[in-house]
Amino acid sequence: LPVHGRVVTIEAKATGRRKAAMGDIKDKLPDQKELERELNEYLSKKYGDRIKLGVSMLVPKAALDEGDGASQDKPKGVSRIQFNMKPEELEAFLDEFVVKQKKAKEVLATKICTHFNRIRYMEENKLQDRFDGVGHIKNNILMIGPTGVGKTYIIKLIAKKLGVPFVKGDATKFSETGYVGGDVEDLVRDLVHEADGDIQLAQYGIIYIDEIDKIASSGHLIGPDVSRAGVQRALLKPMEETDVDLRVPHDPISIMEAIEQYRKTGKRERKKVNTKNILFIVSGAFYGLEDIIKRRLNSQGIGFTADIRSKDDRFEYLQHVKAEDLIEYGFESEFVGRLPVIVVFDKLDVDDLYQILRNPNSPIIQGKKRDFKAYGIDLRFSDGALRKLAERAHLERTGARGLVSSVEKVLLGFEKKLPSTTVSFLAVTEELVDDPEGTLQRLLEDPDNPYWKEQFQRCLQEEREIVTEMVRARAQDYTRRLGETFSERRIACLAEYVIRGGADIPKAFEELTKLQRIIRFHERRFYEKYDLRVTFDEGAVDRIAEKAFLEEVPPRRFLEELLDNCEPGLRLIHDKTGQDEFILTAQAVDSPEEFLSRMIKEYYARF
């Protein structure tokens, strides 16, 4: 601390005092105010009232109290990113969640996987510096489609599957300079926030900008009083490559962090994020674009335009969009040039909406089930009810978004009334969808009527058949790709786990794979510990899966106790016969004593 040209080292004096009192304050640390008061008392005694120590502590206490905790268990930095994922693998994942949009899923899976695999290839072969800035064209993507067709949903799924940070912004909220709305570079800073401050991880993230058609500078669009072309120009550098400063002059937190960094190191450090590997995906409905495409096709006299005109469908025209159409729509050529990949989403019809609701991975139905489960009520839907809900949603002309309001309108009364009753289950049938108020009234008047239970069991059985069919299809795909076989018992176990709300189908298979690794680990551990080899047969694995998924038995603890309990019996057989390899069956899992007793009796019966 500088005082009139001299340097007073408080730390050395405080260290001696701290050592002397270590026994008294071992478990008690002074808070900020106490520390500030003690230091000021010391300075006052030493130099009088001429010197005061002011400590500005604007950081929330909670932030200071945070430890490493569970964060140590999470993959750090880029290690969590799946750089080597193949397009077909990602497309298969999307097929389980996203209905229709075959072409969009194919293009997105291919180009996004290529983007990250190219990054991996360049870095593994140390080519980043060699070709830095030379011929680097990112697979930035433009998605065209109406509201409610799954544009945002599909990008969120991809980001989650790949393990990359993801942020979404609205193009209408940004301006060229930041005077109105936000600065486009704020999206890059938000990406660092989503990456928990990990700049390296953020540099491989995905930035998704919706409503991009609203910044087209064409006269037929009415928007906020800002320069739309200016916003386009502001996006040019981030979409290609630039360095974005994390600290901005008007941000007090950034200023505070810079001061603290300078206080600690005596150096001014500028934290920047390079956008070279950040993937930009933009989307919009682009109403009116089909007219531009139609004029171009007609002027060119393309042979298939007659067929398109007969369909009178804007989405047929959008399939033929070109860069020149987007430029005429109001985008600058430099902006369009940074979006080399164009994807057109299909509109959703009634059957598509029905398939969305029917899909066990549907967030709409699963979310509503969780809402009722929070009150201890088990909610099930009949297939006919899902069809009626889809028909109602289609009338709203808002795509999949209409499904949410359709379900809410039907079930709102039940969600309000049933938590105050003893009702523990509800079947959403065609009858309920047609007359929700009447059905609710009859249920409240006679909740113990066997009719309600019969309807619930019917819905549950329908759902079980649908889920089992989808789990079996997924299992067949595993067999085809990996050679792994699944018994009917294991398929039924996974289906029941999904039905009970334990996980969606992909997650259930991930957990099964993890469980199988745990089983093999304990087999190896038993050999290392006791010099005896044990192997669980397929029936035993099925039974362990049932215990883990349906009976909620912790598998690690269960397997450790099971094998330790089996060791004396197996050791006895080994000592008598020399046998050192054993096959454990489902009986060993359920009744290890009976299993070992039978093995010992079989041994003595031979002699």
Model-identified regions with their sequence ranges:
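Non-catalytic accessory segments flanking P-loop/AAA+ NTPase cores
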Residues: 2-607
